[in-house]
Amino acid sequence: MSADPPITPELVAAHGLKPDEYQRILTLIGREPSFTELGIFSAMWNEHCSYKSSRIHLRKLPTKAPWVIQGPGENAGVIDIGDGEACIFKMESHNHPSYIEPHQGAATGVGGILRDVFTMGARPVASLDLLRFGAPEHPLMRHLIAGVASGIGSYGNSFGVPTVGGSTKFDRRYNGNILVNAMAVGIARQDEIFYAKATGVGNPIVYLGSKTGRDGIHGATMASAAFEADAQEKRPTVQVGDPFAEKLLLEACLELMKTGAVIAIQDMGAAGLTSSAVEMGAKGNLGIELDLDAVPCREPGMSAYEMLLSESQERMLMVLAPEKAAEAEAVFRKWGLDFAIIGKTTDDLRFVIKHEGEIKADLPIKELGDEAPVYDRPSVLTPRPATIAADTIVPPISHGEALLRLIGSPDLASKLWITEQYDSLILGNTIQGPGGDAALIRLGDGPKGLALTADVTQRYCEADPYEGGKQAVTMAWRNLTAVGALPLAVTDNLNFGNPENPKIMGQFIGCLEGIGEACRALDFPIVSGNVSLYNASEGQDIPPTPAIGGVGLLEDASRGATLSIKRPGDAILLLGETQGWLGASLYLRDICGREDGAPPVVDLALEKRIGNFLRGLIANRALTAVHTLTDGGLAVGLAKMALAGGIGARIDIPGHCPAHAYLFGEDQARYLVTAAPEKAEAIRIEAEQLGIACQLIGRTGGPTLELGQEASVAIEDLRRAFEEWLPNHMTGIVIE
């Protein structure tokens, strides 16, 4: 057995600990830590696990509502969806691993978030993903796109959960640090939810699932640092996933949970056995004693340090009722999984690690989490840019050419090349999968349905973090509303650059202020989430990307709305005000070659009023199609409705703002809807009585999109532009 290395300043720095943090450790334990103890502190005090740069700001977010059963602090958030059922969901990042090893990084990102959900007793029913890649022409990007797509697809498909939605966009600032955020959703009975809080002294602590290897050691620490030029040397820190083992683990856990044997349960995710054991003990005000000789290992000669920090996948830690241990073992053996009693709960609030007859660590368990450094980092708030007057922008090309270019651009073009690798229909409950405003799934055999979405407009967040944060929430709220769902709750994934840069910290604070204000105004609490900082590569920070995942409920899923034009002759109505806002728009960036201007202002009261009105129309089956307007504005939104239905449309262009601003401006709180002609006037009158702008702007029908007198574009030309960009870009890629 090799001797532990001496503790030197270089070793401390290699563990991601700053000199003042190491001094804090010395003060806390009154001595020099052992090598194993240094590894434990490194794991528990890194950014990924401790939230040391973000914790003071996260406290400001709204997390409570009458329908919230469990907010942030557990494996996932839990909300009441009626009839004794709960929806359990969360989003997390696997950004750094997916850049280093895209297939395995993305696959284990899916596996990790699924475990967070079924750890709490829920059966996963859906997953989503938010992907951000660099410039498409970057030499690594095809490899990264192909690897991430195959990783998500292979894990989700093999495990047996449908991947039903998400968002994929591109920006050169992600060249060296792509984003892979995975969201999972599960359903459980409200009286059968399990938590990570250990109770009872002397209860056995049980290791369950796959064996421990050397993969993923210091994965959480790697995720808490910016990339430098040696990123590929970190491939050993990327975990390797086995979706079939995870499926067995799911079934074994759910079966065991019905026996009354489980007191507490925690999946082994970031920081592995260390984090799961410390969290269970600290939450229950108990100590934890582990004997690592009992840990099932797949590699010989593993040290205590390696076993504690391994992030091997498909593993769980449980506190069991002692009298149920034999029954629990039988369940796991039946499913072909490892089961080992590796420790016990104690009453001394110590985290004690034994290995090969020696005590390798003896630390105060509460302080490992509670005494982690908390930073109020310096920040510089982003000043709001100047508003761009639409009439100062001269269209460089015709409106028809602009529409074709936008609909075939990387951000707006079809992502079918990616999503066709996902099974969106497995389990048989998917009503609407990728491509709609929100995914829609049926809940069991009853009438209810869940609507799910995940997205963010990082352009807005960079231009004005406060307004961008508000818009990220309202976009999720609108996406859910557009399918007829009542928005209930949010999970977030806050992806930002280096928090030690005051500009980046200012972006973080600004976005959180906007997110918090919007969630409060819309009764849309945040119940779970993740913070991913240090998303930077060789000094280049990513744009602020606070991903918002939303969940909504339909009491009758058969009344849900979709965006496709259903028939010719329907009236087209525009709900909401159109001023022609071009600042920070895709038209300005992709057509005019400019990245400036203030993003659109979000009116939260108006958002709520229009959304509530629209849901009523959908519930009463007054509409035949609904689509929320975001990137690319009205023209792009109408084009997507036409493409989905295979039917064209003609609209009029009023003269109150320039035509290009009317067609491509990105004003918020707007929906494009279709209705039977005889219903249109009644809808317009009802809207105006509520103070909601509603204009009849056209009719559906024909093989073209007729944009007033400005442009006529064939649906087939739009389809070609929309569908061909990504397959053409990816031609010839072979995944090794």
Swiss-Prot record:
GO biological-process terms attached to the record: 'de novo' IMP biosynthetic process
Sequence similarity: Belongs to the FGAMS family.
Amino acids binding ATP: 51, 90, 492, 529
Subcellular location: Cytoplasm
Record-given protein name: Phosphoribosylformylglycinamidine synthase subunit PurL
Enzyme class (EC, first level): ligase
Source species taxonomy: Bacteria, Pseudomonadati, Pseudomonadota, Alphaproteobacteria, Hyphomicrobiales
Function: Part of the phosphoribosylformylglycinamidine synthase complex involved in the purines biosynthetic pathway. Catalyzes the ATP-dependent conversion of formylglycinamide ribonucleotide (FGAR) and glutamine to yield formylglycinamidine ribonucleotide (FGAM) and glutamate. The FGAM synthase complex is composed of three subunits. PurQ produces an ammonia molecule by converting glutamine to glutamate. PurL transfers the ammonia molecule to FGAR to form FGAM in an ATP-dependent manner.
Annotated binding of Mg(2+) 2, by residue: 116, 267
Annotated organism of origin: Beijerinckia indica subsp. indica (strain ATCC 9039 / DSM 1715 / NCIMB 8712)
Record CDD domains: PurL_repeat1 (cd02203), PurL_repeat2 (cd02204)
Pathway stated in the Swiss-Prot or TrEMBL entry: Purine metabolism; IMP biosynthesis via de novo pathway; 5-amino-1-(5-phospho-D-ribosyl)imidazole from N(2)-formyl-N(1)-(5-phospho-D-ribosyl)glycinamide: step 1/2
Positions annotated to bind substrate: 93-96, 115, 239, 311-313, 532
